[in-house]
Regions:
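Short beta-strand edge segments in extracellular beta-sheet folds
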Residues: 159-165
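Core catalytic machinery and nucleic-acid-binding channels of phosphodiester-processing enzymes
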Residues: 142, 156-158, 202-210, 223
Length: 351
């Protein structure tokens, strides 16, 4: 592994010679005045692994579309082609529901592997325009997205969700909130070990059944999007229920938002800043911002802070502790996923 990292560093140094970028640190913080600084949390450093976030589109009162940023990274260590070839300037193709989308729009990789939208006579961006989204083959609420970089043998799968102004959202962290611990949950979930909180799948299944859109927000870097999607949307599907009904439950297949910064930076990054930025980008898609997020679940103070600072009322914010007790941030009332599942119509009245 050490040899591979050495090769990567040598290649990156050569790649940036004579370009607009500058190479400044061990992994390289690449600076280009033509790239927007906020698209990836201000991080344009080297991407070692590939990953992509889902997109949420919200239909506006005038029928226009607005969306969260398009965030995708192609990592240097993804395969032999990415290892030995420069990624700078490579073109990507976008497919929506298996149909080529936006053939006249250039999706271009930066030298560090981040994907940007390039338009004539315009600065690079990570936001699609209304016209571009209207011309995607969107069909219903949940749509299959695929980013293909043919020159590098890269395919990244994600989802595009289309919501309406009257939709109400429930946000949840993953590690320590859906799983029983941060590290143990991540490691166990990545190999399919049963590490989920008691009755958590049943609870979110019922939240979804009552008409709320469940969003997953995690400080995990996008480099782990494949493992995370597999755990949430494959492992935690059709899970055995509990007596007396023994119904089977599944986690709702909602939008997944992970840290857009590189895996190396994500280790030491402030999770509160990332989550607050993501929450704000989602809430700002709605005309009436107050009450858009009807419930928010986490297990750390940073989760609570990001929820409250985004404008979510304390009455709707819940913190789960190591004993799987759920504490309401405003009232201090203690419940559990089991209790909230049994009283689902009181906590989340049907929409």
């Amino acid at each position: 592994m050490k040899t591979i990292f050495l090769i990567c560093l040598l290649i990156n140094v050569n790649d940036v010679k004579g370009s607009a970028f500058s190479f400044s640190t061990a992994f390289g913080t690449l600076h280009d005045p033509h790239l927007p600084s906020k698209c990836y949390g201000g991080d344009l450093s080297e991407s070692l692994k590939s990953g992509v976030n889902d997109i949420v589109i919200v239909k506006q009162s005038d029928d226009a579309f607005k969306s969260t940023p398009f965030q995708a990274r192609v990592g240097k260590l993804s395969n032999w082609k990415t290892l030995f070839k420069s990624r700078e300037g490579k073109l990507a193709k976008l497919y929506v529901n298996n149909i080529r989308a936006l053939p006249d729009v250039n999706l271009v990789l930066s030298d560090s592997g981040s994907v940007f939208i390039h338009r004539p006579r315009s600065i690079a961006s990570c936001l699609f325009t209304n016209d571009e989204m209207q011309n995607m083959a969107l069909d219903g609420e949940r749509n299959d997205g695929l980013l293909v970089v043919a020159d590098l043998n890269i395919e990244l799968k994600f989802q595009i969700f289309v919501f309406n102004q009257n939709d109400r959202l429930v946000v949840t962290d993953i590690d320590g909130t859906i799983t029983t611990s941060d590290v143990g949950g991540f490691l166990g979930g990545s190999i399919g070990v049963g590490v989920e909180q008691p009755r958590v799948v049943e609870f979110f299944d019922k939240v979804d059944f009552n008409g709320y859109k469940v969003l997953y927000l995690t400080a995990r870097p996008m480099a782990f999007d494949g493992l995370t999607r597999e755990y949430l949307f494959e492992t935690l599907q059709d899970v055995d229920g509990n007596p007396p009904d023994f119904f089977r439950y599944s986690l709702p297949k909602g939008p997944l938002f992970m840290s857009p910064i590189s895996a190396e930076k994500a280790i030491s990054a402030d999770a509160e800043i990332m989550k607050l930025s993501t929450l704000t980008s989602i809430i700002n898609l709605f005309d009436l911002k107050e009450g858009v997020i009807y419930g928010a679940y986490g297990n750390k103070n940073s989760d609570t802070e990001s929820y409250l600072k985004s404008g979510i009322k304390g009455d709707n914010v819940y913190l789960i502790n190591e004993q799987s007790n759920i504490v309401n941030v405003a009232t201090g009332n203690i419940t559990s996923y089991k209790v909230q599942s049994q009283m689902i119509n009181e906590y989340y009245p049907k929409l």
